[in-house]
Amino acid sequence: VYIASEYLIKLKSVTLKLCALKTFVVAEIGSNWEGSLKKAEKLIRKCKDAGADAVKFQMWRATDLYSNTHPSWNFIKKSEITFNIAAKLKKIADNESIEFFCSAFYPEAVDFLEKLGVKRYKVASRTCLFKDPQSIETLENKAKTGKPIIISMGMGGNRDQIQKIFSNNKVVFCYCISEYPLAYEKINWNKALQYNGFSDHTLGITAPIVFTVLKKFQDAKEILIEKHVKLKNSKGPDAPTSITINQLSELVSHIRLIEK
């Protein structure tokens, strides 16, 4: 990957005139904060140090999405982000000068995040299926904010209907396949390049670097990369397919080289 990045820089300087690329790098924390504000603060701080543009959390009510008989119920419940916790996470991120935003899964969460002054929202793949309670109401609340929206449709869904809901928002659709981990060979690069966002579930950092290089050659102006990030000792369900802080730092370094 390093050699590929360096080769691209040399090739651009000799033969190509490509526009500068701006890549918005999102560190998806997901469940890797494990219900611990101390771990969340450490993740936020380290993601900032690694060069990420934003940290993203998931704001849902456990009882809306899971049965209390779920084998991971205790962990799920512990990882629920309440209004009080969301406010604390936003303050931590503000103090570290890194953007904080969420995938919000119910309308009241959107209303509260508006009070906190978040700049954008994420729509998760499962929300695009309209099967969770109040999915449509949640999407409509996000649309009413007029703020930028990031959308993953890794489980499918009606893109036309979703685009209609967000007709007045700046929208970035992400290429995404909801498999954990996703085998690199399953990426359809021809299809991926139809998107300006890449929500990656492969192991390591190769896939998002390849996406960035290919979008650069497409002369894209702005793209988005989302990657799950963990601490070394993370044990939650997102941990096996998440990258470490060191890997995030390496990923961002490659992306910033490619952007120029």
Task: Annotate the PLM regions.
Residues 2-260:
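Catalytic cores and adjacent flexible loops of soluble metabolic enzymes
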